[in-house]
Amino acid sequence: MQNITHSWFVQGMIKATSDAWLKGWDERNGGNLTLRLDEADIAPFTDDFHQEPRYIALSQPMPLLANTPFIVTGSGKFFRNVQLDPAANLGVVKVDSDGAGYHILWGLNHEAVPTSELPAHFLSHCERINATDGKDRVIMHCHATNLIALTYVLENNTPLFTRKLWEGSTECLVVFPDGVGILPWMVPGTDEIGQATAQEMQKHSLVLWPFHGVFGSGPTLDETFGLIDTAEKSAEVLVKIYSMGGMKQTITREELVALGKRFGVTPLASALALY
């Protein structure tokens, strides 16, 4: 029988966390990643589960996630080490039948626990399940360097930030036509920032935490990584533009509209209406 470490979901988490570290997005224990699974995904690996799974109560019940398994990164764990010891740095957890807590079925060895941002992840999963009819399964948080840098120099509002990212790279409007949500600065690891992030996730697949990082959501690990990677590439272009004296020309409103029509997406109206 195949070991769980060779499963598609453990291998996918290893690749995503390794790639994110190589990108420079996840220094030290920065960043966290969760993937919503189905019972059928984990059923072949019950022999690998802990004999006495630890139970941890959630700070607030999440009945929408009842009986749902997830694979998650651990609190205080370094992304660069996931590939070296998946069972120490990742965990498969399953929310209980009333959504009040979860059991750690596999991994998170040596009394480790899931990421401190689990409230933000689970609340965001709930919103993205509703927003996408269950298609979105991944929530990824990382410290994408250039996106963070832009939060210091651009006005932190959704229409402006979205419009500038669309202008920074032609593919951006196609990849995230719903724009980028932005929070005020908040203390991380709290229910409050989790609730605020989830509220923005009702409308946007990308949410910026100013001076901190970004949250992204998507149907697969590849799609979610690619979403953040696309926004971060545009942010890198913008950082270079602003360091060279600013834009002399850019993609116009009319061109953005034409781009949306060509690829069958509806651009965020408030970003289009800016100028």
Swiss-Prot record:
Cofactor stoichiometry and binding remark: Binds 1 zinc ion per subunit.
Pathway: Carbohydrate degradation; L-rhamnose degradation; glycerone phosphate from L-rhamnose: step 3/3
UniProt KW keywords: Cytoplasm, Lyase, Metal-binding, Rhamnose metabolism, Zinc
Domain of life, source organism: Bacteria
Cofactor: Zn(2+)
NCBIfam families listed in its UniProt record: PRK03634.1, rhamnu_1P_ald
The protein's name: Rhamnulose-1-phosphate aldolase
Organism: Citrobacter koseri (strain ATCC BAA-895 / CDC 4225-83 / SGSC4696)
Record gene name: rhaD
